[in-house]
């Protein structure tokens, strides 16, 4: 099965590659190249990008900032990443639009659901920045929300690891990878794939989540084509 419309949740950390912070241009171009291939094959792609490579609201809050203020700074960071990703995609030959939940007319369209869907239908990639426009919500929740709004068939969570494990595979060599999980498993066992709000949104709207390693070239195409890759979370195991 090849998905016809998919949403990719791309963490800010993925964009920084091996750097301690910021953006690695080579990573951006690699991701753009992989996305261009699936767009050429007819799949409609939307992307929600995080901002943790620049600023993370929870860390700012822990350091003494007002939580809402810290979250707004984090939302601005996601727009910076979205514009950078747009540049990379367009240099790879992919027409791309950035839509921001926070109004920034000079650099991004406002988020308008029907316009976003129309862009997708025309073969453009839509990158959503600004989170969902409200503090206290993660970009994972934004990904689940936007996926439901644009009728995406699947959410791909593109990360630095090749799936979901019972514990941190970087710390424990005997960590076990899950090939399939149910949403109920994730919620009941508090498995840290996404926050519970994002998981519940996908569960209620019957949108499966596939977690895979973005740094393996060709993985986006494999995921889009329905190949068994990473870990799949759905309503049935």
Swiss-Prot record:
Which InterPro entries does this one have?
A: AceGlu_kinase-like_sf, Asp/Glu/Uridylate_kinase, Uridylate_kinase, Uridylate_kinase_bac
Location(s) in or outside the cell: Cytoplasm
Against CDD domains, the record matches this protein to:
AAK_UMPK-PyrH-Ec
Q: Which domain of life is it from?
A: Bacteria
Q: Where is the signal peptide?
A: none
What GO CC annotations are associated with the protein?
cytoplasm
Give me the residues that bind ATP, please. Answer: 9-12, 52, 56, 159, 165, 168
Under which pathway is this protein filed?
Pyrimidine metabolism; CTP biosynthesis via de novo pathway; UDP from UMP (UMPK route): step 1/1
Catalysed reaction per UniProt?
UMP + ATP = UDP + ADP
Q: Where are the bilayer-spanning segments?
A: none
Single Gene Ontology MF annotation: ATP binding
Chief subcellular location: cytoplasm
GO biological process entries: 'de novo' CTP biosynthetic process; UDP biosynthetic process
Give its E.C. classification number: 2.7.4.22
* Residues the record lists as binding UMP: 51, 71, 132-139
Activity control note: Inhibited by UTP.
Alphabetically ordered keywords of this record: ATP-binding, Cytoplasm, Kinase, Nucleotide-binding, Pyrimidine biosynthesis, Transferase
State the Pfam families in the record. AA_kinase (PF00696)
What do we know about how this protein assembles, alone or with others? Homohexamer.
Belongs to which family?
Belongs to the UMP kinase family.
Q: Which HAMAP family match?
A: PyrH_B
Q: What does this protein do?
A: Catalyzes the reversible phosphorylation of UMP to UDP.
Q: Which NCBIfam families match?
A: pyrH_bact
Protein name (record): Uridylate kinase
- The gene it comes from is pyrH
């Amino acid at each position: 099965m090849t998905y016809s419309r998919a949403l990719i949740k791309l963490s800010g950390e993925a964009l920084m590659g091996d750097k301690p912070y910021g953006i690695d241009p080579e990573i951006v171009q690699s991701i753009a190249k992989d996305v261009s291939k699936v767009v050429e094959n007819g799949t409609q792609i939307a992307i929600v990008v995080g901002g943790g490579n620049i600023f993370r609201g929870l860390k700012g809050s822990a350091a003494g900032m007002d939580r809402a203020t810290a979250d707004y700074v984090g939302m601005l960071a996601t727009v910076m990443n979205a514009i950078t990703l747009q540049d990379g995609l367009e240099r790879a030959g992919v027409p791309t639009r950035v839509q921001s939940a926070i109004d920034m007319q000079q650099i991004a369209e406002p988020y308008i659901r029907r316009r976003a869907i129309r862009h997708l239908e025309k073969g453009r990639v839509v990158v959503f920045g600004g989170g969902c426009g409200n503090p206290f919500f993660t970009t994972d929740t934004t990904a689940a929300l936007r996926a439901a709004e644009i009728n995406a068939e699947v959410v791909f969570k593109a990360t630095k690891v090749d799936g979901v494990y019972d514990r941190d595979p970087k710390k424990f060599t005997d960590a076990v990878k899950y090939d399939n999980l149910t949403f109920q498993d994730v919620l009941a066992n508090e498995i840290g794939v996404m926050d519970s709000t994002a998981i519940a949104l996908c569960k209620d709207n019957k949108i499966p989540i596939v977690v895979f390693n973005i740094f393996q070239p060709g993985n986006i195409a494999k995921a889009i084509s329905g190949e068994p890759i990473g870990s799949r979370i759905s309503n049935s195991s």
